[in-house]
Amino acid sequence: MLDINFIEENQKDVEKRLNHRGNDFSKDLKFVVEKNKRRKEILVEVEKLKATKNQLSKEIGFLIRDQKNGEIEQIKNKIVQMDVQIVELDEELKIVVKEMNDVLAGIPNLPDESVVVGADENDNVEVRKSSHPNLSTQAEPHWEIATKLQLVDFELGPKLSGSRFLVYTGLGSKLVRVIADILLTRHTNHGYKEFFLPVIVNAEAMYGTGQLPKFEEDAYKTGDQYLIPTAEVPLTNIHANEIIDGNKLPLNYTSFTQCFRQEAGSAGRDTKGMIRLHQFNKVELVKFAKPEESMNELEKLVIDAEAILKLFDLPYRVIQLCTGDMGFSSLKTYDLEVWFPSQNKYREISSCSNCGDFQARNMMARYKDENNKTQYVHTLNGSGLAIDRLIAAIMENYWDGEKLNLPPVLQPYFNNQKFIK
C-alpha cells in the first residue's frame, strides 16, 4: 500500500497521478488523510493521559508520606478514570487504523513519472520488436494443431474439471516438462535462485502482494487459504516481516508452478485454446532491490524474460504499459507479446513490473542500507514465461501445414527429432 504520510504531504499530486489510472480516488484519499489525522490525535491524547497518570502516581507517594489519605483517594479515582479513557481511546485507535488501512488497501500504486499517460491498451507504447511476424493467411489456430497432433485433449479437461481446463497428453505432456526445465536452467544460469513452492498460501501472503482485498473474486479459495494466482505471491512473501542485509541485494528468485485463476470478467474471451485457463503453468521471476537500483533491475528483468523468446526464435515485441493499463501494484510495467499468426496479432506472454515499496509496506519487507538505516525494499516480478502460451505460440509459428517443426533448442530433448507429426 501507499505511504499514508506521503499521501498526507502530497495529497494533490497523489490524486493527480492516481487519476491518470482512469479512476477518481479523491474521496478515498480524503478519507484516509482524515483517519490518519484522527489517529495522530488519539496518540497525542493517550500520551498526555499517561504523562498525567505518571505525575499523579508520584504525588500519591508524597501524600502517603504526609498521611493525607483523603487526597490520595481523590487522585486514585482520577487515575481510574484516566485508565478507562485510555482503554476507550485504544479501542477507537484500532477502529480508526482498520478503517484507514481497509481503504488504503484499495488504492493502487502511483504510476512512475516516466510512464506514458493513457486510458487503455491502445495508448501503450511499443519499445522494440524482434523479427517480422509470419503474416500467412493459411495459419491455423493452435488448438487445431494440438488436436491434430494429439498433444492436448481439449475435451478431457472439461470432462474432468469444467470449462477452461485442458489435459496435455503424450508428447504434449513432455513439452510442458521440457520447456519448464529449459526456462529454469536459463534463469538459474543467469543468477536466479530456484524455489519449489507450495501452491496454497495464507491470506496474509495474498494481502502482501496486493491480490487481496482487490482481486479476491478472481482467486480460488480452500478454507481460509488460497490457491496461488501466480508464484509471485509465495516468492515475494519469502521476505515478509524480515530485514534483508543490503549487501546481498539485489536478490533474484525463480520458480515453476501451476497457477489458478477464476478469470472473473473474462466470459466470452479466449474460450478456445490455451490462452486463458483456470489452471496454467508458469515460470516466475522475482527481484528484491534497493530503491535507487530498482528501475535498472526492471530493465534486466525484461531482458531475462525476453531471452526466452529469443531462445525459441519467436516473433515478439516489448511494450510499455500506459497509466490506464497497468496492474494494481505496479509503478511501471513492460509487457512482452508474442505473435500468433492465426489471430494476426501479438498476445501477452509476460508482464514485468516494478512495484517499488508498495508490496514491501504490506509485507514489512525491509533492508539495512549502507548507513545501517532500515528502509523498505523494492520488489519486482515478471513471467519468465507463461508456458501454455509459449507452447501455443510455438505451435502456430512452427506449423507448416503438415508437421510441427521443433525449435532447435527443443530438438535435443526429443532425440534430435526435428519435428512432431
Give the predicted meaning of each segment:
Residues 1-133, 147, 151, 155:
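N-terminal alpha-helical targeting/anchoring segments
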Residues 26, 129-421:
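TRNA-recognition modules of translation machinery and tRNA-sensing kinases, especially anticodon-binding
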